[in-house]
Amino acid sequence: MSYRELIFTVAAETAEPLGDALLDLGALSVTVEDDAAGGYDENPLYEEPGLSPEVQAWDRSAVTALFNPEIDTSGSAEFIPELLASLKEVGFNLAPPQEKTIEEQDWVRLTQSQFSPIQIGERIWVVPSWHDAPNDPNAICLAVDPGLAFGTGSHPTTHLCLLWLEQQSHLKNQSLLDYGCGSGILAIAAAKLGCNPVIGTDIDPQAMVAARSNADINHTAVTFVLPNEGATELAAETKYDIVMANILANPLQVLAPALVNKMKLGGRIVLSGVLARQAEEVIATYSQWLTPSVWKESEGWVCLHGTLNQDKQNTASTVFAAPAQKKF
């Protein structure tokens, strides 16, 4: 079976209402993307919890609709003109769309083929659970099945956190909290590098399912808890040698007092999910408790780190908030 894919190029303000109209006219699915994606003029849009993007679509948005060919009862040649006429009746005067035929595929196999083992630093390998591990006796292999959770190791923010962990020389028996853990990849890596105990938390129940499954696959002792479970691992009096949060700049700032409150005196914090242009603002927020700095930059993203100062330890809030979900 094949599907009919139609791609309309429209202005930002037209994208969402056009998508709704196409669904009303029988589209199986609709996606909106940057028409310049992959090119020089590509314009990233980021939405963070508590902070909406300045615009909701791109100046030139590609609206892609997928149709079942069986909906075309009037013959192939008439389908697009009739669709355009129907759209015109509800206020859309559009040029004919690009058209493609999408063949039915084994979508699971296709998706899996897009993930390959990733080497990070000298020793860490992120290996999809359906791939064989590399033949390297010194490799620290992280078998990951992301499911619906963020964290496959391919994104620069995750990559930076893993690289930070690999380059630390004294992790044995250091306690670590992975805040907003997603697939659990950072917590699992920390456990394999010697951290103990290791705790991961995320507001998303699907992330907990993926993270616990990944911990089992990797034979690692990591505890994953939801923030509303009342776990002692998240109690105000429980502190950690390392607090790691790979979320986004706005929630990192909003949750700064709670994150700092989870740090032991002299403990370290690692913050990722921050664009290079946002680094100064995040650093300013955390400077009331520690002296944060940019540890490393990759593809426009930065990883920040810092150590809790003794004279500022008591200024952090004791209220521990739920981690924000990361959206990509």
Curated annotation (Swiss-Prot):
Cellular localisation: Cytoplasm
Pfam families assigned? PrmA (PF06325)
Give the top-rank taxon of the lineage listed in the UniProt record for this protein.
Bacteria
Asked if Lipid biosynthesis is a keyword of the record, the answer is: no
Keywords from the named record: Cytoplasm, Methyltransferase, S-adenosyl-L-methionine, Transferase
InterPro entries in the record, alphabetically?
A: Ribosomal_L11_MeTrfase_PrmA, Ribosomal_PrmA_MeTrfase, SAM-dependent_MTases_sf
The record's GO molecular-function terms, alphabetically, read: protein-lysine N-methyltransferase activity
Q: Does the keyword Methyltransferase apply?
A: yes
Q: Which PANTHER family match?
A: ELECTRON TRANSFER FLAVOPROTEIN BETA SUBUNIT LYSINE METHYLTRANSFERASE
In Swiss-Prot or TrEMBL terms, this protein is called: Ribosomal protein L11 methyltransferase
Q: Which organism was this protein described from?
A: Polynucleobacter necessarius subsp. necessarius (strain STIR1)
Which gene holds the coding sequence for this protein?
prmA
